Amino acid sequence: LLEAFMSTHSLIPSTGLGLPIARMRAVFQPAEVERKLHSLQAQGSDKEHAALCQTYQRMLERGPERFAVKPSGVPDMASLYDQLPNFTEPLDDVKRHVALSHASADSLELTPMLLLGPPGVGKTHFARLLADMLGTQTSLVPMSAMTAGWLLSGSSSQWKGAKPGKVFQALVDGEYANPVIVVDEIDKAATDAQYDPLGALYSLLEHDTAQSFVDEFAEVAVDASQVIWITTANDERQIPKPILNRMNVFQIEPPDADASRRIAAQLYRSIRNEHDWGRWFVDDLSPDVLDLLAPLPPREMRRALMTGFGNARLEGRDHLTPDDLPRNGPAKTRMGFVQ
């Protein structure tokens, strides 16, 4: 496991942190899983609950140990501040928590945060960059697309097609005891008279109760106390007060023109470095291309840049020009019958 960790993280871009420090932490108790499995087998219910038995067997085969990572020192984070100029306050909060865990046996414990702001200001982008900096993985839970209330906490194994929730999957099927879980657009969670889609968060956002979180499918306790929670929303009025009170709330404003240019420049370099084909292109964007990208939200910037890279490649150029970028927002392809 440690060799796999070192192999994975030797390629993480430098942010002034060095390699993360990894400790092993048990995310469940094997004895409890064994009892549940033996109980099903003794009752002759192993065929009826085949998916549940397979889950227990998979847990026992992998074992309970997962990486719990934290930066090896107090971070410089200059690169992140440059890439996320409108996220100064949440980055400051992260830096404080990292400083507390530095040079101690304590694990990194971040207070759950709510990033409040209009669509397209880079809230989910922030979460991914934070996970990269900390050396852990990201799991996205899109509440606006939720079709059932059990997405976070799983559904009872009594139901047909039941399966574990996102928290269980991130911890048991993932590599880390402290993944970043992003609950996206928490204010758009559908309300249901039979099931509160946010109900699981009441215990998950509290460190003490999260230590023994029980997924409704697996019905065994998992330790979710190390999860790094980031929620995003456009309207805090739609979020229950008890959940708001469990989080640090940060208002994220759209970046100004100068900050938007820096974001576009960083995003260009990031995309270029992420792909093998990036070696075909020059290191930086020209000022006229930056001028066109700056008014766009980060999400649209990325789409525009990908279009630009493709058009430049088709023309055999190693740089993007204004003509490579899409005009008048995202293009829509018309389909229909030819008359």
Which residues fall in each region the model found?
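C-terminal engagement/docking regions of AAA+ P-loop ATPases
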Residues: 315-339
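AAA+/P-loop NTPase substrate/partner-engagement loops
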Residues: 133-163, 170, 260
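Conserved catalytic/switch belt of AAA+ P-loop NTPases
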Residues: 183-222
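Pre-Walker A (pre-P-loop) alpha-helix and adjacent loop at the N terminus of AAA/AAA+ ATPase modules
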Residues: 71-116
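AAA+/SF3 P-loop NTPase mechanochemical coupling elements
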Residues: 175-178, 213-232
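Interdomain "pre-motor" coupling segment immediately N-terminal to P-loop NTPase/helicase cores
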Residues: 24-74
